[in-house]
From Swiss-Prot:
The keyword Disulfide bond is assigned to this record: no
Protein name: Dolichyl pyrophosphate Glc1Man9GlcNAc2 alpha-1,3-glucosyltransferase
Residue ranges that the UniProt entry lists as topological domain Lumenal: 1-3, 123-128, 170-173, 246-319, 381-386, 431-450, 502-505
Chief place where the protein resides: endoplasmic reticulum
GO MF, any single term: dolichyl pyrophosphate Glc1Man9GlcNAc2 alpha-1,3-glucosyltransferase activity
GO biological process assignments: dolichol-linked oligosaccharide biosynthetic process; protein N-linked glycosylation
Gene that this sequence comes from: alg-8
Entry EC no(s): 2.4.1.265
Length: 505
């Protein structure tokens, strides 16, 4: 088969040139967060990393990410020694900005390598579709907005995730897949949401006999279990062991899992609770007319979604336990099928649906977590047109919901034009590359997908531009609420559509 043009490397070179131009762009408080972590890991002994609180941006990622920051800090001191002083808060010299921006680009090479692994592992007939999916991830507006403007290190971590998913394709590399994912968990604990799919797939394919029966279910492949369990234990020991020696595990867990936060973030992530919050807002206006009681204390919470604020004025309050039960329930449903039919595509679908469930029903979900769904789904979105039909509204809703992260006027045309161009280019390319399904497509869902994308155009125009012209500084929460709620409709609709596709495959 002829080489596909442009290659991933060529796309990465062009993308890097564009990202370098964004070095002076807006940066969020996450920039100071990571500068402070560089300072903590470089200036303080290991035992003090998870106790240091000079800055409000304390270290709250697992140890492997702290080690990652320590490695970068060894180079940071050469770029500008002042950036790694713990007490040098809010320090952002141009050397610091350029250094931290470059670290995001350089570490994103892990993503490039993983995507090339994905393309190379795909059979010839499907390689062009796999290449298109890989390029769409490499040039993702989500990664551009979150990593290269807002500032985070998602590229390297999603690269590790994709490498783990690709390694799961072959039985010979299943062990490596599980160990790579374990290492990822020790870098960022948000990937715990995907762990149930890994557990079920590795249990079924690696630890149990290939042909399952009531008798053979208890005949585990003992040596495989020992290798997998021992390898995972060794990785967690390498990450947490030094801190366990100082009895610091409770302190680390208190940083990793702060349960005092509210149900919704200050800007509602586009999930079920965004629709629930929106419904509560509507009922506040309707309650006096239809005789519903209103909780007066909840009305005092104007912004709704502040830390610790989970009250609703009309609807019942939601507790962390409810979120946990719902998340677990909607993760378990597709995992039953994965256990019974453990194919690689089914595994990627299971990972995607675990991401959906955690995003839609989780407690205090950030809008950035939508990448947990978009990126694994991208790997199978071109399997056929039924899959693509479920992916379309997710791609639109997920990326548009990230717009409020970047609220500065200078970056408005960048995020808007880039995202729209990406959506038009890749959704059109995907439509040409996705083969016809073997089963009948969902007519109503196709209509929903088309209607949803059509309505999103004027909504983006109003929320991004017209609201400010009409109302100025008034009703500032209104476009955020519209964006979140409408995006939530797209994500929920996409989830329902993909659930149908997954179970009828």
């Amino acid at each position: 088969m002829a080489e596909i043009y442009p290659s991933l490397v060529q796309c990465a070179i062009v993308a890097t040139a564009f990202k370098v131009l964004l070095f002076p762009a807006y940066k969020s408080t996450d920039f100071e967060v990571h500068r402070n972590w560089l300072a903590i890991t470089h200036s303080l002994p290991l035992w003090e990393w998870y106790y240091e609180k000079t800055s409000e941006w304390t270290l709250d990622y697992p140890p492997f990410f702290a080690y990652f920051e320590w490695i970068m800090s060894q180079v940071a001191r050469l770029a500008d020694p002042a950036m790694i002083w713990v007490h040098n808060l809010e320090y952002d010299s141009w050397q610091t900005v350029y250094f931290q921006r470059w670290t995001v680009i350089v570490t994103e090479l892990v993503l490039l390598y993983a995507l090339q692994m994905f393309v190379d592992s795909t059979p010839g007939v499907s390689k062009r579709a796999a290449h298109a999916a890989a390029v769409s991830i490499l040039l993702s507006p989500g990664l551009l907005i979150i990593d290269h403007i807002h500032f985070q290190y998602n590229g390297v971590m999603y690269g590790i995730l994709i490498a783990s998913l690709v390694l799961a394709k072959k039985k010979s590399s299943l062990l490596a897949s599980g160990l790579v994912f374990a290492a990822l968990l020790c870098m960022k604990h948000i990937y715990l949401y995907l762990a149930p799919a890994y557990f079920v797939y590795l249990l079924r394919v690696y630890c149990l006999p290939p042909k399952l029966s009531p008798r053979s279910i208890f005949r585990i492949q003992f040596f495989n279990c020992v290798k997998l369990g021992g390898g995972i234990a060794a990785i967690f020991a390498a990450a947490f062991g030094p801190f366990a020696l100082k009895n610091q595990i409770p302190q680390i867990f208190s940083r990793l899992f702060p349960f005092s936060r509210g149900l919704c973030h200050a800007y509602w992530a586009p999930n079920v609770w965004a629709l629930y919050s929106f419904m509560d807002r509507l009922l506040i206006s309707l309650a006096p007319r239809i005789g519903l009681p209103i909780k007066a204390d909840a009305l005092n919470s104007v912004t709704r979604g502040l830390v610790g604020d989970t009250s609703f004025a009309v609807l019942p309050d939601i507790t962390p336990r409810m979120c946990f039960v719902l998340t677990l329930l909607f993760q378990a449903i597709p995992l039953i099928k994965l256990f019974m039919r453990p194919t690689w595509e089914g595994f990627i679908g299971g990972v995607t649906l675990c991401g959906y469930a955690s995003f839609l029903f989780g407690w205090h979900v950030h809008e950035k977590a939508i990448l947990l769904v978009i990126i694994p789904f991208s790997l199978i979105a071109l399997k056929d047109r039924r899959y693509l039909g479920a992916f379309r509204p997710l791609a639109v809703a997920g990326h548009v919901s990230l717009f409020p992260l970047i609220f500065t006027p200078a970056e408005f045309p960048i995020k808007t034009v880039y995202t729209i161009f990406w959506l038009v280019l890749f959704l059109m390319a995907f439509d040409r590359l996705a083969p016809a399904p073997t089963r009948q497509r969902l007519f109503l869902f196709d209509r929903f997908s088309t209607a949803y994308i059509t309505v999103s155009i004027p909504l983006i125009f109003y929320c991004s531009l017209m609201h400010g012209i009409i109302f100025g500084k008034s009703y500032e929460f209104l476009p955020l609420m519209f964006t979140s709620s409408y995006s939530a409709i797209g994500v929920v609709g996409s989830w329902l559509g993909f659930m149908v596709v997954y179970f009828t495959e």
